[in-house]
Amino acid sequence: MGTIRLMHAKLHRVQVTEANIDYVGSITIDPILLDKVGILPLEEVDIVNLNNGNRFSTYVIPGETGKGEICPNGGAALLCQPGDLLIIYAYENCDRQEVIQRGHTARVIVADEDNKIQDFLIQTLVPCEDGNKVEFHNSSMIDTILESSQT
């Protein structure tokens, strides 16, 4: 059936904290955000700027832990300014038939104005009994995240 590209991670409405034209490409992101959704350093991401509609692709580098940093670098810095809201997507290639048979899971962080986790969503494709399609499910896991951070 072929290969399809599915979102596996998303940072929704993160706020640009800095734009650094002098750095050689990429986007710097707080490692806490990267770890929670499963984006790796050097992974390619697509970015949408909600303030001006700019869309671009780049790769990720981790910033300082816990600082909430979102910093487009190099040419990407020309497409954003501090305060802009971004959506950052990461994808993976999947075998279509395997997704239909076994499903797929994506992790989504919805950020607050300080780039802290406001909501944490698990979005899943669940195989249907007939084996020919999947159902989409969207569940908030914020209570689980908050409980685990308190222990």
From Swiss-Prot:
Gene Ontology annotations of biological process type: alanine biosynthetic process; pantothenate biosynthetic process
Class in the EC hierarchy, top level: lyase
GO CC annotations, alphabetized: cytosol
Residues the entry annotates as binding substrate: 58, 74-76
EC number: 4.1.1.11
Details of cofactor binding: Binds 1 pyruvoyl group covalently per subunit.
Annotated catalytic residues: 26, 59
Single Gene Ontology MF annotation: aspartate 1-decarboxylase activity
Keyword Membrane applies: no
Pyruvic acid (Ser) found at: 26
Metabolic or biological pathway, per its Swiss-Prot or TrEMBL entry: Cofactor biosynthesis; (R)-pantothenate biosynthesis; beta-alanine from L-aspartate: step 1/1
Catalytic activity as recorded in UniProt: L-aspartate + H(+) = beta-alanine + CO2
Keyword vocabulary terms for this entry: Autocatalytic cleavage, Cytoplasm, Decarboxylase, Lyase, Pantothenate biosynthesis, Pyruvate, Schiff base, Zymogen
Compartment list: Cytoplasm
UniProt PTM comment: Is synthesized initially as an inactive proenzyme, which is activated by self-cleavage at a specific serine bond to produce a beta-subunit with a hydroxyl group at its C-terminus and an alpha-subunit with a pyruvoyl group at its N-terminus.
Obligatory cofactor(s): pyruvate
Keyword Phosphoprotein part of the UniProt annotation: no
Family to which this protein belongs: Belongs to the PanD family.
Subunit structure: Heterooctamer of four alpha and four beta subunits.
Alphabetized PANTHER family for the sequence: ASPARTATE 1-DECARBOXYLASE
Function: Catalyzes the pyruvoyl-dependent decarboxylation of aspartate to produce beta-alanine.
Protein name: Aspartate 1-decarboxylase
